[in-house]
Amino acid sequence: VWPFETLLLARAHRDTLPALSGPERDALADILGRLTRRYNRLFDVPFPYSMGFHQPPTDGAAYPAWHLHAHFYPPLLRSATVRKFMVGYELLGQPQRDITPESAAARLRELPEE
């Protein structure tokens, strides 16, 4: 639904942030920095986004299939002033994409990190 939405997945099977090794935490910090710098360069503004990590429930049960991941949901659509808003048909029916995920990913990949 969000044109520049990003899903981050650990390469190795990890279920929680504390389960990451030191080098894995460093790699996560690096990719978070690289992604947010590219977001900021996309429209040359501090790029707004909502981000969250998904970890297993903490109810004491085992969740061996759970895989740590994070979602970024940036609301900007085509420029620094055009935002994507969820409206009735997207909330209650079929999501609409103004930009394909492939073209959004290509635009982010083409941006310099620095």
Where on the chain are the PLM-derived regions?
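HIT superfamily nucleotide-processing domains
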Residues: V1-E114
